[in-house]
Structures are given as structure tokens and as C-alpha cells.
């Protein structure tokens, strides 16, 4: 049973209409992938989805499966996520160096780990879920 698919660095093709293996648990896209994903039907059992360095597409209307526990967005991702309907199962969320949109974000109640690699804006008005155990900011954070 296929559980992991890892697309190489140069992969940058549409994944709309792809029928994923039902057993898929881990899906990773290489550094050049930058295709729209709002219409993608994700595998029902996928737990971890990782986007590479150049991914920078809106995700506000993505229908994430209930099984997702970890989402990782690469360096270029910089779209607002305040309208994203995160799955309740999401425990780990990672954003890369270009992400600057924490205010107004609806975070899942079970989120335990949040990484914002180069976030450097005030966080005094950011609402953190009670479940959060690990919060990481990069070296440039000074607020």
C-alpha cells in the first residue's frame, strides 16, 4: 500500500483531477511546485501535506480532509489565511519566510505546534489556542 508520495524539485504540474491512493498518508511537493490547489480532492487518509519553497497560491477555499494533522508551507507562501477552514485534526502548522498574516486567523482548537520562520510583526493581538504547546519564530523576530 502506497503511503508516501514525494514529488521532486522540478515538479510543477496541475494536480486537479488526480485520484490519489486511498492509503496515502504523506504528500510532499518539491521546491518548484506552484499550482492552484483549491479544486484538489485530497486523499481521505492523508495526514501530512508539505509544500515546497515556491508554493504561493491561495488556500482559503481548500477542502482539507479531516485526517490532516500537519500542514507545511514553504518559503514563498504569503497569502492571507484568515478565511481558511482548517481541519479540526490539525496539530502542526508551519509557515516559511515570506508569511506575514497571523492576525484574524481562525486556528484549530487542537493546534499544538506553530512555526512562523521569519514573522516579524507584533503578536499582542493574535489569539492563540489554549492547546498551543510550541510556538517558534525565526531569528528576525523582535516584537
Model-derived segments and spans:
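Leucine-rich repeat
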Residues: 1-3, 20-26, 42-48, 64-70, ...
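Concave beta-strand-loop units of leucine-rich repeat
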Residues: 4-13, 28-35, 50-57, 72-79, ...
